């Protein structure tokens, strides 16, 4: 059985729990809830857990280093489990995708996302799979304040559906491969 390291990006602490920038943590928490895998073990400068899901051995990781240092945590876990970049799936928020949309991608730049920038620096590559959870862009104001703000009330009302769609995309990526998953989820 192959193994996957599935990483949700976010910032630690209750202050950030419902912020847009924590969409990766939220998806990972939803996956943990659905799969029964507890993400409570302190390891790799983060919280981790492991188990079987989608016919794979999966290692779940929520770096607790703050977003701009996430790469350290991910690099530690990849080394420990002796996994390669092809075994890595990163879940993160994306300003360039409207709220409610979930898109899949292999490789690419960081697009100004500090978590992805840290991963590129620590891993020396961006050649890994991503689940991009759309948070949209602010109509007015600063992007930093926008991503660090909680989801709006109307967004919260449909957030569970977005998280479930993200988990469905992840499951299809693992079971049926990235091309099939991209053809379905990127067309939505």
Curated annotation (Swiss-Prot):
Keyword field = Cytoplasm, Hydrolase, RNA-binding, tRNA-binding
- What is this protein identified as? Peptidyl-tRNA hydrolase
Q: Which Gene3D superfamilies match?
A: Peptidyl-tRNA hydrolase
Please write the reaction equations for the catalytic activity of this protein: an N-acyl-L-alpha-aminoacyl-tRNA + H2O = an N-acyl-L-amino acid + a tRNA + H(+)
Q: What is the lineage of its organism?
A: Bacteria, Pseudomonadati, Thermodesulfobacteriota, Desulfuromonadia, Geobacterales
Binding annotation for tRNA: 16, 66, 68, 114
PANTHER family assigned to the protein according to its UniProt record, in alphabetical order:
PEPTIDYL-TRNA HYDROLASE (PTHR17224:SF1)
Per UniProt, the enzyme's principal EC class comes to hydrolase
Q: Which GO terms describe its biological process?
A: protein quality control for misfolded or incompletely synthesized proteins; rescue of stalled ribosome
Identify a single GO molecular function assigned to this protein: tRNA binding
GO CC list: cytoplasm
What this chain does, per the record? Hydrolyzes ribosome-free peptidyl-tRNAs (with 1 or more amino acids incorporated), which drop off the ribosome during protein synthesis, or as a result of ribosome stalling.
């Amino acid at each position: 059985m192959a193994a996957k390291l599935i990483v949700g990006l976010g910032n630690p602490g209750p202050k950030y729990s419902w912020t847009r920038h924590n969409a990766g943590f939220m998806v990972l928490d939803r996956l943990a809830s659905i799969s029964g895998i507890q993400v409570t073990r302190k390891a790799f400068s983060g919280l981790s857990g492991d188990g079987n899901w989608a016919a794979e051995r999966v290692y779940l990781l929520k770096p607790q280093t703050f977003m701009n240092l996430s790469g350290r945590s991910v690099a530690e876990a990849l080394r420990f489990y002796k996994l390669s970049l092809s075994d890595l799936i990163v879940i993160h928020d994306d300003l360039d995708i409207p709220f409610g949309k979930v898109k899949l991608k292999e490789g690419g730049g960081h697009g100004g996302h500090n978590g992805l920038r840290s991963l590129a620096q620590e891993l020396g590559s961006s050649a890994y799979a991503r689940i991009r959870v759309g948070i949209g862009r602010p109509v007015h104001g600063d992007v930093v304040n926008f991503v660090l703000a909680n989801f709006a009330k109307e967004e919260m009302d449909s957030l569970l559906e977005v998280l479930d769609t993200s988990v469905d995309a992840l499951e299809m990526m693992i079971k049926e491969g990235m091309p099939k998953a991209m053809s379905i989820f990127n067309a939505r």
